Amino acid sequence: KMKKQEQQKNGCRERSLASISRRVSSGAMLVALAMIFSYVESLIPINLGVPGIKLGVANLVTVTGLYILTPMEVFVVVILRVLLVGFMFGNGMSILYSLAGGILSFLVMLLLKRIKGFSMIGVSIAGGVSHNIGQIAVAMCVLENTKLVYYLPVLMIAGTITGILIGVVSQKILPAVSQGAGAERKNG
């Protein structure tokens, strides 16, 4: 009987390690994908007269991740993406702005995802808008210029439009990503 219990423990341990390995490799893959998206996006010039407007393609990873990973795993992916992209392609200020936008966006999307009645597109829109709010808040503090708040309406419209696009694409790819990764949808 003791031998059987020991075998069951070892079996659970092996399944647990396999699960951890699968989650770590999935997280690493998502970080790499987000980095690629960020880099490609940096090559696309968007000049609409207001600095800071981007498509936010890397947010595909964050939005989709909220539906297939645990909140902590998504948070780690967001932080790693911001830091790695910032160190490789940006500078200290870009890291600061991206951290503010990324963390606020993550928290808002996580909260809204947990509230019944918000679709993936709605969650994504809120993420796009809150990302811009976070960045403007940091810019106002760093530059000690409250007049930057006047950029906010345009950035909120841009965040809404890009949020819709990212949300629609995320909704379309979620079934394939969930199935391909062998992930179960997390409602956390």
What are these regions (language model features)?
Residues P51, N91, I95-L96, R114-G188:
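Membrane-embedded alpha-helical hairpins and interfacial helices in multi-pass inner-membrane proteins
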Residues V24-M29, L60, T64, P71, ...:
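Hydrophobic alpha-helical transmembrane segments
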Residues S38-L55, V78-L110, M120, V142-K147, ...:
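Interfacial aromatic-anchored transmembrane helix boundaries in multi-pass membrane proteins
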Residues K3-K4, K9-T64:
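Hydrophobic transmembrane alpha-helices
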Residues K4, E14, G27-V31, I36, ...:
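Short helix-perturbing small/polar motifs within transmembrane alpha-helices
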Residues V31-Y39, G86, G102, F106-L110, ...:
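Transmembrane alpha-helical segments of multi-pass membrane transport proteins and ion-pumping complexes
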Residues V57-P71, V108-K113:
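Generic transmembrane alpha-helix motif of multi-pass integral membrane proteins
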